[in-house]
């Protein structure tokens, strides 16, 4: 008796980035504050991708829809304030059936100095309430993060509490360093949209110096 074996080929989900979430707080009072570094980068990426942000209340944020290499790419700036960022990211990921591995979050990072940036996948939230809420909304920590260094008041010699520090604008030299990081991030995001995270990481981290 001959046995017939059937091989089922399951489609492999692309792990290239399809949703970019810039974190920050909405409104003019917060526009220039350190906590809004993710918004700053998201605005530049929308320009690079020739996309325009528009309010989509069902997704709790300003959403921009773009195309890259024939694929759809979404950008979002949540309007729920930092601590509820997961509402927007979770709603978009569910509606468009995106895996956590296809999500890139842009956020400020206290543990990196201005002028430094790191790309990483997974890990904890290190007390960052925006990341904490996104992790809960996605049910996984396996999304990608672009950590934009803003420094810590202690390492920058400032007598400020962290909560106050992140809600103030960077000093001029800090802003210049952050702007340089944003420029470097813009250069490597296309590689992430292509799924080449090794290239993006190598190019991005080489600019951090010793």
UniProtKB/Swiss-Prot annotation:
Residues binding tRNA, per UniProt: 30, 81, 83, 129
Catalytic center residues: 35
Reactions that this protein is recorded to catalyse: an N-acyl-L-alpha-aminoacyl-tRNA + H2O = an N-acyl-L-amino acid + a tRNA + H(+)
EC number in record: 3.1.1.29
Alphabetized InterPro entries for the sequence: Pept_tRNA_hydro (IPR001328), Pept_tRNA_hydro_CS (IPR018171), Pept_tRNA_hydro_sf (IPR036416)
Annotated site (Stabilizes the basic form of H active site to accept a proton): 108
GO terms assigned for molecular function: peptidyl-tRNA hydrolase activity; tRNA binding
Enzyme class: hydrolase
Function (record text): Hydrolyzes ribosome-free peptidyl-tRNAs (with 1 or more amino acids incorporated), which drop off the ribosome during protein synthesis, or as a result of ribosome stalling.
Family the entry assigns: Belongs to the PTH family.
Protein name: Peptidyl-tRNA hydrolase
Organism this protein belongs to: Bordetella petrii (strain ATCC BAA-461 / DSM 12804 / CCUG 43448)
